Amino acid sequence: MSSAAMVKAEDSLEPTLQNLLDQKTLRWVFVGGKGGVGKTTTSCSLAIQLAKVRKSVLLISTDPAHNLSDAFGQKFGKEARLIDGFTNLSAMEIDPNGSIQDLLAAGGGQGDDSMGGLGIGGMMQDLAFSIPGVDEAMSFAEVLKQVKSLSYEVIIFDTAPTGHTLRFLQFPTVLEKALAKLAQLSTQFGPMLNSILGGRGGLPGGQNLDEILSKMESLRETIAEVNAQFKDADLTTFVCVCIAEFLSLYETERMIQELTSYHIDTHCIVVNQLLFPGKDSSCEQCKARRKMQKKYLNEIEELYEDFNVVRMPMLVEEVRGKEKLEKFSDMLIHPYVPPQE
């Protein structure tokens, strides 16, 4: 008997992600979990399903590993690009390490060169990177800034592993601290630096430090606006991806607790890589692993009885390319029926 049968049908929620397709107000979907559990495959597959019911869908990778290009067999960059074979599904990969440099360059060039050769660019960059989590915060802010200028009906984030994702979601607080520190430095040294820069011809594009700080304040306002949307369950949800093992389950529980503390909705869990050996299977390892997985599946059912829990099988081939992703995505909507155990 499968673990699904251990929960009464009338008490259990639909074991699919169909509810996300039916929620027409949904604008932001985050897909996250521990490394190596199938986040990218799940986010790509969900994007494919959403593209069937929405006018325009954007899939964004904020994971430094960037697996979207590998999943679809197509190169993506920091500009949104239509995915081959689709008319309304685009993808982009943001480099989390590039956004602060881009912002602080503020007029062209890199590092010291962009600050008139005075080393101020390096100083500002070091200051920014010295604040814990600011890299995640700023890269996320840059993503939002780009997304805000585009017109997509729903946006899916293929996020970095759990720790990075949770820091991403704390970015408003982190950015406030960064801005406060920069404002303090500007008050203390701004007139002197502007005077020195004036003698050296100023910053590229005729900007000054006040203009840079003004840009950062504008960025903060964008973040505040989108952050309000993130806390609206009608607009935003987080899909947790895990496997039926202790560490993954532990990470998922920690993530759900943190998401709840941030007031971000989460009600869907995708459990990947499940083994379903047939009744006559002679694979002892498969049976032993299935026994372990059933134990953790039971725990998931007990812990998250008010969640949509989707069970996905371990496949014999890698899920890469449009065809295989489409096949995998169907199982997110139409539950996989395992062989009789």
UniProtKB/Swiss-Prot annotation:
Molecular function in Gene Ontology: ATP binding; ATP hydrolysis activity; guanyl-nucleotide exchange factor activity; identical protein binding; metal ion binding; protein folding chaperone; unfolded protein binding
Positions of Zn(2+) binding: C283, C286
Record-listed E.C. numbers: 3.6.-.-
Top-level enzyme category: hydrolase
Keywords for the protein's UniProt record, in alphabetical order: ATP-binding, Cytoplasm, Endoplasmic reticulum, Hydrolase, Metal-binding, Nucleotide-binding, Transport, Zinc
Superkingdom of this protein's organism: Eukaryota
Residues at which ATP binds: K34, G35, G36, V37, G38, K39, T40, T41, E245, N272
Active site, UniProt feature: D63
CDD domains, per the entry: ArsA
GO CC terms in record: GET complex
Subunit architecture: Homodimer.
Function recorded in the entry: ATPase required for the post-translational delivery of tail-anchored (TA) proteins to the endoplasmic reticulum. Recognizes and selectively binds the transmembrane domain of TA proteins in the cytosol. This complex then targets to the endoplasmic reticulum by membrane-bound receptors, where the tail-anchored protein is released for insertion. This process is regulated by ATP binding and hydrolysis. ATP binding drives the homodimer towards the closed dimer state, facilitating recognition of newly synthesized TA membrane proteins. ATP hydrolysis is required for insertion.
Protein name per Swiss-Prot or TrEMBL: ATPase GET3
Species in which this protein is naturally found: Paracoccidioides brasiliensis (strain Pb18)
Gene assigned in the entry: GET3
